[in-house]
Amino acid sequence: MGNVVYKLTSKEIQSLMAQTTFETTKLPQGMKARTRYQNTVINIYSSGKVMFQGKNAEQVASQLLPDKQSTTGKHTSSNTTSIQYNHFHCIGSDEAGSGDYFGPLTVCAAYVSQSHIKILKELGVDDSKKLNDTKIVDLAEQLITFIPHSLLTLDNVKYNERQSLGWSQVKMKAVLHNEAIKNVIQKIEQDQLDYIVIDQFAKREVYQHYALSALPFPDKTKFETKGESKSLAIATASIISRYAFVKHMDHISKKLHMEIPKGASNKVDLIAAKVIQKYDIQQLDTISKKHFKNRDKAIHLINQKYNK
């Protein structure tokens, strides 16, 4: 039986618990929650550590915690040396919306040549994780005018259809990343491509298993954790994918005449309950990811209100 251990923040634990049902009562001292998911036991401890136990522990951990590396040292980047990607012509890919109950899953692949590096730094792309949504929108609307890219959006209806067919979020992301990358390759001179660098959400073998099609250039393809800090191509893709997610969320808010929050917090539960009350559960399902625990929590809030 394999064991994989992670150290998570409170926000990361909240996001993990939103993805499946956990037991939170009658637990041993020091344990916060536990569940069994795909024949893997998941224990969440008060210390912030999370343990996955089972034959497929690593694979399940990669699905539910795609952006984390384990403290057991088993989840490492596929790259053994540090590559200075900004000295090369690269396609980078990243996604947005995977941890948000409301809104779609958006994926972008973007091509950044060496000639783009100076202007991207001047625009502030290298600080992409520090940008608020307003700045993301302003910056992305400039980037899409001169950066070869492919932006794919999996709306909630299609997302929920695939999830009901047994697709994990990792599979959805692998398929979308691979398609976006292939789309960009068609837009550039292939001899002007040194690397394809993917913001790592799963190990290479897991990605290849789920992608449905082969990696376009396996020898040039790298997977990097915290990739936006290592590659301006990933940072650019991150901004454009986030831009698409933000614009879609704005559209949902206007359509429903209420502010729809990002994330998967308790505030999200309250707004989901309001959507059900104002419209119905079917409307909620068209703008959200059904398998997140927020849906059940919203229904519980409504039941509590009417059973008082």
Curated annotation (Swiss-Prot):
Chain ranges of the RNase H type-2 domain:
88-304
In alphabetical order, the GO MF annotations are:
magnesium ion binding; RNA binding; RNA-DNA hybrid ribonuclease activity
InterPro entries membership: RNase_HII/HIII (IPR001352), RNase_HII/HIII_dom (IPR024567), RNase_HIII (IPR004641), RNase_HIII_N (IPR024568), RNaseH-like_sf (IPR012337), RNaseH_sf (IPR036397), TBP_dom_sf (IPR012295)
**Which keywords appear in this protein's UniProt record, sorted alphabetically?**
Cytoplasm, Endonuclease, Hydrolase, Magnesium, Metal-binding, Nuclease
Q: EC number(s) in its UniProt entry?
A: 3.1.26.4
Task: Give its localization.
Answer: Cytoplasm
Q: By its UniProt entry, which SUPFAM superfamilies does this protein fall under?
A: Ribonuclease H-like
This protein's GO cellular component annotations are: cytoplasm; ribonuclease H2 complex
Per UniProt, a divalent metal cation binds at: 94-95, 199
Q: What does the UniProt cofactor note say? A: Manganese or magnesium. Binds 1 divalent metal ion per monomer in the absence of substrate. May bind a second metal ion after substrate binding.
**Family in the record:** Belongs to the RNase HII family. RnhC subfamily.
Name this protein carries in UniProt? Ribonuclease HIII
